[in-house]
Each structure stands twice: as C-alpha cells, then as structure tokens.
Amino acid sequence: MIDIPGTPGTLTGLVLRISQCVFAAGSISYMVTSGGFFSFTAFCYLIAAMGLQVIWSFGLAILDTFALVRKKTLLSPVLVSLFVVGDWVTSTLSLAGASSSAGITVLYFGDLGSCSFEAECWKYQLSVALAFLCWITIAVSSLTTLWLLASA
C-alpha cells in the first residue's frame, strides 16, 4: 500500500477524524438547543446521522491515536476495508441528513417565511452548515481510504 496523506494511523488521518467529531458535535448541539427541531423529521434524522458520525469518528480517532503513540500501522487490507465501508455508510447518511435538513431550512424559513424567531433560524442554518462541513471531511476520509484500498 502506498503512503497517502489522511490514511488511518497518520497525523492527517487523526486531524480528519477529530474535525469530523467536532463538526458533527457542533451540528448536534446547535440543533438540540433550538426549540422546535423535533417537529421536523429531517432535523431528527440529522441528529441521528450526526450522532452516529460522532461515535464512528471518535472511535477511529482513538484508534489513530493508539497507532501514532505505538507507532503501529493500520494498513492491513481487512482494517482498510472496514474503514472504507464505515466511512461510506456514515458519509451517505450524513449527506442525506444535511441535504434534507437544508431543504427544510430553505423551504420553511426562506421560501415560506415562517421563521418568527431569528435566533432559532440561525441555529438551524448553522447546524446544517456544520453538517455539510462534517460531510466534506468524511468525504475526504472515505475517498482516501478507498484509494488506499484500491492501491493495495
């Protein structure tokens, strides 16, 4: 396997995992602190998808930290295959949650003008923006691990 920046067990891989955790946790926190998120199914789905992303990314960040401290490699084909599948699943779920929440945000709060609380609208929009940033970092990780698996 070739050395690609962002692969599991490297510092750039750890930075990607930590940024995924931070963006997903930020998205959850802004959505949960807004008042009526539970009345929109897309927002509830976004929280579920971002919650799964936090768990997945935090677990892999711990694994990356362990590999860096112990100077171990995480490039066995079985592990890389697991990373590819997990990253692609969480990437798909995160993109679906972010896109559906963005659609609801634009429809209800932009087109219909039914946002009477400005602070709540900003929280929804910020949560969706953080979800898309999370998805971008997941996409980078998943493409990196797929490229790594294909080069084996």
Swiss-Prot record:
Q: How does it sit in the membrane?
A: Multi-pass membrane protein
Q: Where in the cell is it found?
A: Cell membrane
Tell me where on the tree of life, at the top rank, the source sits: Eukaryota
- Where does it mainly reside? membrane
Which residue intervals are topologically Cytoplasmic? 1-21, 99-127
Cellular component aspect of the GO annotation = plasma membrane
Give the transmembrane ranges.
Answer: 22-42, 43-63, 78-98, 128-148
Which segments does the topology annotation call Extracellular? 64-77, 149-152
Organs and tissues of expression:
Expressed in the stele of the root and in leaves.
Q: Which UniProt keywords apply?
A: Cell membrane, Membrane, Transmembrane, Transmembrane helix
Recorded family membership: Belongs to the Casparian strip membrane proteins (CASP) family.
Assembly behavior: Homodimer and heterodimers.
- For this entry, the protein name equals CASP-like protein 5B3
Report the source organism. Answer: Arabidopsis thaliana (Mouse-ear cress)
